[in-house]
Amino acid sequence: MRNTTKLVVHVVDAQYLMPRDGQGSASPFVEVDFLNQLSKTRTVPKSLNPVWNQKLYFDYDQSVINQHNQHIEVSVYHERRPIPGRSFLGRVKISLCNIVYKDDQVYQRFTLEKKWLLSSVKGEIGLKFYISSSEEDQTFPLPSKPYTSPTQASASGTEEDTADSETEDSLKSFASAEEEDLADSVSECVEGKKSEEVKEPVQKLHRQEVFARPAPMQSIRLRSRENPHEAQKPMSRGANQLHPQNPNHLQSYGDTDLDDFKVKDMNLDLGERWPNPNAGERFTGTYDLVEQMFYLYVRVVKAKELPPGSITGGCDPYVEVKLGNYKGRTKIFDRKTTIPEWNQVFAFTKERIQSSVLEVFVKDKETLGRDDILGKVVFDLNEIPTRVPPNSPLAPQWYRLEDWRGEGKVVRGEIMLAVWMGTQADEAFPEAWHADSASVHGEGVFNIRSKVYVSPKLWYLRVNVIEAQDMIPSDRNRLPDVFVKASVGMQTLKTSICSIKTTNPLWKEDLVFVVAEPFEEQLVISVEDRVHTSKDEVIGKITLPMNVFEKRLDHRPVHSRWFNLDKYGTGVLEPDARRKEHKFSSRIHLRICLEGGYHVMDESTMYISDTRPTARQLWKQPVGMLEIGILGANGLVPMKLKDGRGSTNAYCVAKYGQKWVRTRTILDTLSPRWNEQYTWEVYDPCTVITLGVFDNSHLGSAQSGTADSRDARIGKVRIRLSTLEAHKIYTHSFPLLVLQPHGLKKTGDLQISVRFTTLSLANIIYNYGHPLLPKMHYLFPFTVNQVDGLRYQAMNIVSTRLGRAEPPLRKEVVEYMLDVDSHLWSMRRSKANFFRIMSLLSGYFLVGKWLEDVCNWRYPVTSVLVNVLFFILVMYPELILPTMFLYMFFIGLWNFRSRPRHPPHMDMKLSWAEAVGPDELDEEFDTFPTSRSQELVRLRYDRLRSVAGRIQTVVGDIAAQGERIQSLLSWRDPRATSLFILFCLAASVVLYAMPFKAIALASGLYYLRHPKFRSKLPSLPSNFFKRLPSSTDSLL
């Protein structure tokens, strides 16, 4: 069977190549090597900036390709003439993990690299590469000759395209009927000096026949299930408050065991209980980080030949599975169905099995009276087989129905069932109906299942507003004050008002938005006139769809475009009869693109879990695998009342990168056991995984709350991957802490197991020497205000999209996991940060105190040794740096014994949560803007003024010291400056005449002199410095 999937390498152009022909030029061609398949372009004679615009095709079979270990090698050569031969000009290696489909292709420029150490290489090459399986791209002529030499290969037949269809289509998608001429002119300008496109067949070195059809590339997309016209609701900037009904708050920690707030080692042997066929390979089994839990699975497939009901004569069949006191029912079919198919799975935990037999009843739903029993099937639990993956699924079988009275009489009808004993690793586990959730009905059944979510793919939309023409206001007697307003969904940004009142304003300002795939919103551009401080008049408006904007991966310039403005705001792609009424229209000049070289941050940089740019073409290879086993929780606090007692319906959410996971909800227990394991690819070890525990309030019952109820937060755990040792399993119990308006509260413990497996140590070391974020964040950074605003909008989009999944990951959960309120003011956080700085500086303070003790000869032996060491270092200064680094090396080895054994956790002392006052907590949980009384706000403002006054004094003292240094040579104090410059002259003569070692030795011995030779008065330099003037005298 012939493989129809092709890898297309579109060689566009090159720039600034190295001359090779001895006349300051070169005749370059490109050769591409992909898995021993060679193909080359034509030769462009006498050009250092050649343009090929040629496509090369290669067979692509994903079933035999390892994307992480194989590359495409693109080499540039100079063709020597008249003597056949070639000279190397540079090459580029492209990893297969960066390959995308044709719809996502983007033009990229690569810097040419050397092949050998002494090679002389410079220049760049422009390429597009993608995978295509369409018939249009497969129609190319077959080669008539095998690959021989560059001269012969360049003479092979090619097929020419009429135009660059991508650029043409993207431009014409903007243009309306009146703008076709403009689109054509812009298309010609974009093509520039590009030659006609050439499609070149593959010249194979080794021919292979592939009989297996290649598997398609896997991509995960979050599909929209919501009405696209529904408006997004912005996030509330206020802090979320949690008020459980039975709070046991920790007001004082004097009598509390502080060990309850520390990480505890569980010491569980998790991997030994699971069958592991790949024990000798690099990766272990799929479920080797959790405890094994056995379940009795019953799969009800379908039934046939069912008898009619005894009352109505018809049949509305359904199946009831009974095991002890647990009962589960399938959906009901109507009478029109002769062979009902349910295909439902029921799961009963082995720990709660209370019977030795399993009964499966087939019943007929009756409108009046009891349901009629058509028959049953009975299974002895001792005879049920056990099945654990990777064993194949158990095939269902047909069973004859027996009389439900137990007489052994066979009745009419058969039912197809599969019954087996399995574990949570079974494929049927996520979608099965669980016996412990029998009290959940309606939509609540879907809200308790475990699910995996994917964050939407976020882009930065950059709108560069350049200028506008013919801005005619409604009042022709005045010149307009013009500004531009751009909107995308709920995001709205404005440019400044043009500094000059004119009908042809100029701005050159950038407006940046956050948009998500699939693109649902449109960009609305309106030009408005500031008539009055409270009145703006729209001059023109235009609506543009997102999918027509150009995507760029670097800082290359994007082509700008003029757009006609419409008074009614009609888009350029939407013909409207009203547009024909106006023969004259204003115009605006815009440059719009989707930025793929940035990472769109939806979480704080301190807790970032993903640093990859938006464009998949720029992703690096993964450096490791992160495996998390969510075992369970212990000692959870009751979050609601049920039947007069406390109850908690807990589930756990984990977020790392773009992948979110949610465990199933365990009902009515304070010690839930999930035992679910998940895996993530790691692209940067300096990232953080976040796990949160919540109480489910959407179970479809009156006791569980209404649709407007919020899932209460129970606690959160963060783990930084760089703090974990590779290939080691960490099994710990982490305390869950929640800060509430009444104080800090421990809500339980989360038990998890973590393993970080490295794929390549060299790649991890490589990451430590490179920036955390993509290079565009440093070459063209956003301002601080832009970063905060864009992060807020990104969190809004992520919470909205995940809230539309089924079951939804609710807004309050996403906000808590992304720390939406981390930027709000808090006196507690300010104190915590201040003491963090003091703790950081405490080491320097200890060194200063130790040095003071040495100078005062408080410990004579130490002082003598320091003097001797100082003398040696002065006489042999080349030993200073080696001694310092060797000292740090031995300190690091010494500290290895006391290295941290546990991952970091939420520290209540570091967070300053153990001594915070109730008023400060109430202030932290206040909304933004405030919702407290005026008197309370006044008291807090006075307190903030007192704190700011102390900070103001410290900052003023620091500024005064710096100004005194500046005044040394400023002649603000003529006598002080005269003395200082005379001292500098004398010092220069002395330093020139005397050896440096003698001066350093004399200065050091003077500093370390005995207290007998010291005075308690300040030194002469200190007295002189404190007398210098500063700008404090000039302050009001």
UniProtKB/Swiss-Prot annotation:
Residues 1-110, 277-399, 440-563, 607-734 form the C2 domain. The chain crosses the membrane at residues 871-891, 979-999. Residues 158-168 have a biased composition (Acidic residues). It is a multi-pass membrane protein. It comes from Arabidopsis thaliana. This is Multiple C2 domain and transmembrane region protein 2. SMART domains: C2 (SM00239). GO terms for cellular component: plasma membrane. Belongs to the MCTP family. Residues 146-155 have a biased composition (Polar residues). Residues 190-204 have a biased composition (Basic and acidic residues). Ca(2+) 1 binds at residues 316, 364, 366. Gene3D superfamilies: C2 domain.
